[in-house]
Every structure is written in C-alpha cells, then in structure tokens.
Swiss-Prot record:
<keyword id="KW-0436">Ligase</keyword>
<keyword id="KW-0862">Zinc</keyword>
<comment type="similarity">
    <text>Belongs to the QueC family.</text>
</comment>
<comment type="pathway">
    <text>Purine metabolism; 7-cyano-7-deazaguanine biosynthesis.</text>
</comment>
<dbReference type="GO" id="GO:0016879">
    <property type="term" value="F:ligase activity, forming carbon-nitrogen bonds"/>
</dbReference>
<dbReference type="GO" id="GO:0005524">
    <property type="term" value="F:ATP binding"/>
</dbReference>
<feature type="binding site">
    <location>
        <position position="197"/>
    </location>
    <ligand>
        <name>Zn(2+)</name>
    </ligand>
</feature>
<protein>
    <recommendedName>
        <fullName>7-cyano-7-deazaguanine synthase</fullName>
        <ecNumber>6.3.4.20</ecNumber>
    </recommendedName>
</protein>
<keyword id="KW-0547">Nucleotide-binding</keyword>
<dbReference type="InterPro" id="IPR014729">
    <property type="entry name" value="Rossmann-like_a/b/a_fold"/>
</dbReference>
<dbReference type="InterPro" id="IPR018317">
    <property type="entry name" value="QueC"/>
</dbReference>
<feature type="binding site">
    <location>
        <position position="185"/>
    </location>
    <ligand>
        <name>Zn(2+)</name>
    </ligand>
</feature>
<comment type="function">
    <text>Catalyzes the ATP-dependent conversion of 7-carboxy-7-deazaguanine (CDG) to 7-cyano-7-deazaguanine (preQ(0)).</text>
</comment>
<dbReference type="Pfam" id="PF06508">
    <property type="entry name" value="QueC"/>
</dbReference>
<keyword id="KW-0479">Metal-binding</keyword>
<comment type="subunit">
    <text>Homodimer.</text>
</comment>
<dbReference type="GO" id="GO:0008270">
    <property type="term" value="F:zinc ion binding"/>
</dbReference>
Amino acid sequence: MKRQSALVVFSGGQDSTTCLFWALKHYETVELVTFAYGQRHSLEIEVAKEIAQEQGLKHHVLDMSLLGQITENALTSDIEIEAEKGEVPNTFVDGRNHLFLSFAAVLAKQRGIIDIVTGVCETDFSGYPDCRDVFVKSLNVTLNLAMAYDFVIQTPLMWLDKAETWALADQLGAFDYVREKTLTCYNGIIGTGCGDCPACHLRQKGLEKYLAEKGDA
C-alpha cells in the first residue's frame, strides 16, 4: 500500500533521482524541492527542472543564495577541488543538508506533507558530517519539536554503496534514465561526467562494480 505523499529533496543527480523513482513507487503523490545556493553550475537546477517536467511532478525551486555568500568551498567558489586523506573535502558546504532539510520541512508542512525523502548516504562516506544517519535522526527529532509536526525523513540510500544504488535504480526501472539524464559531475557534465572529479570517480566505480556483479561488464 502506498503512503499518501512525499517531498523529495532534489538536485537532479544520481542519488536524488534514484530517490525520486523510489518515492514514485511508494507514494501516491510526489513533489520535488531544489535549492539554488550559489552552486558553480546553475545547470544543476536546469537538469532538475527538466527531470521534474518529464516526470510531470510539481517542482519547487527555493533561493538559498545566502549560503553561497557565507561559505567558501569548491562547489560555490571558483577554487580547485581538494580532498586530503582524513580531512573533510573542500566540496563540503557547511550547513547545506541541515538548511535544505529544514527549509524542506517548512515547505512540506505548508503542503500537508509528512514524509521528506533525501538521498544522503553514509556507506560511501566522503567525510561529509551531514550525511550521517545520526545527524538525520537528530534533525528529524528537532524539526518535529520545532514545528509540532510529525515529519518522517526517509533515507532510502543511507546504507547502500554506489553499486547498490545503481542496483536500486535498475530495480525501479530507472537505470538508463539515471545513467543518461542526471548530473553528478562537479564540473557540470551530464551523464557520464568528466571522469576526473571525486563525484565522477565514485559514480563510475559503483557503476562498474554493479555491472560486473550483474554480468554486463
């Protein structure tokens, strides 16, 4: 039995698009919310809009440009991507998931939606503290207390590695769609990406592992 409605935090990338198709399977009504936070590649927002339109879903785009004004990182500033071993990579945007989920919750309540779906994942941990299960559970409690509302933050990818995320997309009938139409690349290249940035490496490594396990490599 499908639940009534869900709001998906949506960037147009592999993970959030997989979550979109997961939500379509589990909910009667699905809406999307995308945040414009000053990211270097505004193409991300256009990709999200295009996918939302193709799927016939209501799509909210919220202006969070202030975040790009108060943080300096490789996703909002023109600086080289760095990832030192044992340190948080400079692609981490301080407060991003905290703020995104908080604003998504405000929107969800106004829309009469309880379930918020996000593609954060702890298994392929990239050093991002706001992708941890403990953070999401803590914020869920805080949001419920703050707004006297029974939100449920759904994290269908939390314990999946990238190969398993590809497998889920395949199970949902969305493998080719996710592979060809999503934007994960930090350098703004749709689909296969640049092949050089950390996001592309993680995505491609997971894809190769999944195809090898499936016997399609």
